[in-house]
Amino acid sequence: MKLGILGAGGIASTMAKTVAGMKNVEAYAVAARDLERAQVFAQKYEVKKVYGSYEEMLADDEVELVYIATPHSHHYLHAKMCLEAGKHVLCEKAFTVNAEQAQKLFDLAKEKKLLITEAIWTRYMPSRKMINDIIESGVIGEVTAVTANLSYTVSHVERIRKPELAGGALLDVGVYPINFASMVLGDKVKDVKATAIFQNGVDILDSIAMVFEGDRMATLQCGAREISDRMGSIFGTRGYMQVQNINNPEKITVFDTEHKEVASYVVPEQISGYEYEVESCMKAIQEGKLECPEMPHAETIRIMKILDDIRKSWNYEIPWIE
């Protein structure tokens, strides 16, 4: 399968390096608004075709699947362009800036009979099944609570610090702890409360409490100005487990009620972790599906609505959207 990469930044580089180590897919084309930047990218990662505009790449009949690696403020526009050009789409998180945009893209993809999915990579990783298998084994009993945190020192980055780019920690970083909690506790959310510290009009430190059906709770934190331990903890009636790095799980450790380690698991060796979402897209496309089972459209919409509600509770309005 021939992959076109839309954007030539850091995550685009990771995708190009990942695809180079995969079978049955090639990084065939790259497009950037700056042709010279795209040329440097293509030379570095041995990408065959180079384009100085997104429109030119989308006019290339050889491109089958497009990976959107631009800021999330532009995801809706760029994904719409791809679909209208007849391309399948793997779009980075946050999928869009709100649920309304996401639904429009899903409706268009259905009309065009094209696959589109959100590249929230933790949904596709083997660690997800590993965590679920441990829970289902009953070793930690009934799961009643989850905590997770993820923070990076990225408040200086343009896409984070500018309200007009839908900036802030929530859409860029907060999607990971929210998805982590949802993968463990499910989709029956009864209540969400969130507080935030704002700087220059965007949230830079967020605390989120989610109450799920069955009297279960997730307590989450994300930030853009500090470093956190990236830990995810899942608590049960007979023990608990800790997931090292919720953004790219490395190790899962299980403890009993006496806080003694009873098991430890290391995730399988991987290229980068991006390969799983690409493999899922290829399989779905080959099977004629319009979504990936790891991140169905309904789940993207559900998460986007949670993000919308949180932002609304803060009176955080994106200037060009609301």
Please place each PLM-identified region on the residue numbering.
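N-terminal Rossmann-like dinucleotide-binding module
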Residues: 1-45
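Beta-loop-alpha module in the N-terminal Rossmann-like domain of NAD(P)-dependent dehydrogenases
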Residues: 15, 48-108
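Hydrophobic residues in well-ordered beta-strands that form the structural core
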Residues: 51, 91, 116-118, 147, ...
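C-terminal helix-rich "cap/oligomerization" subdomain common to oxidoreductases
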Residues: 65-67, 213, 280-322
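Rossmann-fold dehydrogenase core element
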Residues: 103-121, 142-146
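Predominantly a Rossmann-like dinucleotide-binding segment in NAD(P)-dependent oxidoreductases
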Residues: 122-193, 198, 317
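Contiguous beta-strand/loop segments that form the cofactor/metal-binding neighborhood of enzyme cores
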Residues: 179-251, 268, 279-289, 321
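Active-site loop of classical SDR/Rossmann-like NAD(P)-dependent oxidoreductases
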Residues: 267-279, 295
